[in-house]
Design a protein with these regions (language model features):
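Conserved alpha-helical substructure of the radical SAM core
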Residues: 10-17, 21-141, 148-149, 308
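N-terminal amphipathic/basic-hydrophobic helices that include classical n-h-c signal peptides
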Residues: 1-6
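Accessory C-terminal segments flanking Radical SAM cores
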Residues: 206-311
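Soluble or luminal CAZymes and related metallo-dependent hydrolases
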Residues: 88-92, 122, 176, 214, ...
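Short, flexible loop/turn elements at secondary-structure junctions
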Residues: 68, 116, 145, 169-171, ...
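Short, charged low-complexity linear segments at domain edges
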Residues: 38-57, 195-207, 249-272
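Conserved AdoMet/S-adenosylmethionine-binding subsite of the radical SAM
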Residues: 120-245
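Extracellular structured ligand-interaction cores
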Residues: 57-59, 162, 219, 283
Length: 311
């Protein structure tokens, strides 16, 4: 990691001569390179970010449904807490995406998820619309491998160049994983598998007692890269997004960005998004989470909440 980090710094010094390595945004950029999230091919994008007031969102979760086929106890998205899950209409999702793209210049990776995205009956329409957006570099669908797409229109959409699938392999719970891999191979759909045999628990949603300095340290160690976009609002993470919708996490208006109902002009909103993404030091939701702390413990993978069991 350190060797790669130094290489990244050297590459940035050569390619971004007018930016100091101490720049706080650049420090996060170096971490992203070193962590393998970006390659050298993205150097021009980072030049634009740092030198040309160019707003890039590296990764953002695009939530199309809160309905899921599993009830994982330690779900980071809090899906088991939704008693009345929603599947958003194509019209709303198009409007939501258009609004976001008014303010950002580039989305490196749009992560389509839920819930379980293959549950959405009109996923092909959502993908066909998103793939036409030049500001979106790639689209990744995250599935738990329990639902096999059978709609010919959807399969045709999945074949498009920008689109790929990542299967979160939950062992025996991902009952359609092998069939999905075979379908992707047969139809030349890009597909990969992400297997994490040991999960970690973010803990319950009760408030912890932590000082501002402790929260800053927790936030630094959490080091979340991917933001979450739910119902027209940009949140720092999926736990905050779902928790806020459920009313279990009370986020202030400064702790998310409501791009669907903003009252400022485009430049004001762009500046706020940039400030939110790079200058946030912690959010209130951190008080209701153990990630980034010693309290974050390993737990069994994809343990299911039993029917009727209270969370």
């Amino acid at each position: 990691m350190s060797a790669k980090r130094n290489l990244c710094k050297d590459l940035i010094r050569v390619n971004l001569p007018d930016v100091k390595i101490k720049n706080k945004i650049l420090r996060r950029t170096v971490k992203a390179f070193a962590g393998g999230i970006y390659g050298v091919s993205h150097i021009s994008s980072f030049y634009n970010i740092l030198c040309k007031d160019y707003l890039v969102m590296p990764q953002i979760d695009f939530v199309i449904t809160t309905r899921c086929s599993l009830r994982c106890r330690e779900c980071a998205n809090l899906m088991p807490y939704f008693k009345e899950p929603e599947t958003y209409s194509v019209e709303f999702l198009k409007e939501e995406l258009d609004k976001l793209l008014e303010y950002v210049d580039e989305i490196h990776e749009l992560r389509v998820l839920g819930g379980e995205p293959f549950i959405h009956p009109h996923l092909n329409e959502i993908l066909d619309y998103a793939v036409t957006k030049k500001k979106i570099n790639r689209i990744v669908i995250f599935t738990n491998g329990t639902v096999l797409p059978k709609n010919d229109l959807l399969i045709e959409s999945l074949r498009k160049k920008k689109i790929s699938i990542t299967i979160s392999d939950y062992g025996t719970w991902s009952k359609e994983k092998d069939n999905l891999l075979e379908l992707c191979k047969k139809n030349k759909i890009k597909c990969g598998v992400n297997f994490i045999p040991q999960w970690v628990s973010f803990g319950g949603l009760q408030k912890r007692k932590r000082t501002a300095e402790e929260l800053k340290e927790q936030f630094r160690k959490c080091d979340n890269v991917c933001k979450s976009y739910l119902e027209g609002k940009i949140y720092w993470c999926e736990r905050q997004a779902s928790g806020n919708k459920l009313g279990l996490i009370k986020s202030t208006e400064k702790e998310y960005i409501d791009v669907m109902n903003n009252t400022g002009n485009i430049e004001q909103v762009r500046k706020r998004i940039l400030d939110y993404c790079y200058n946030t030091r912690y959010i209130g939701a951190c008080m209701q989470c153990d990630k980034g702390t010693d309290a974050c413990k390993e737990v069994p993978m994809a343990e299911q909440v039993k029917k009727g069991e209270l969370l």
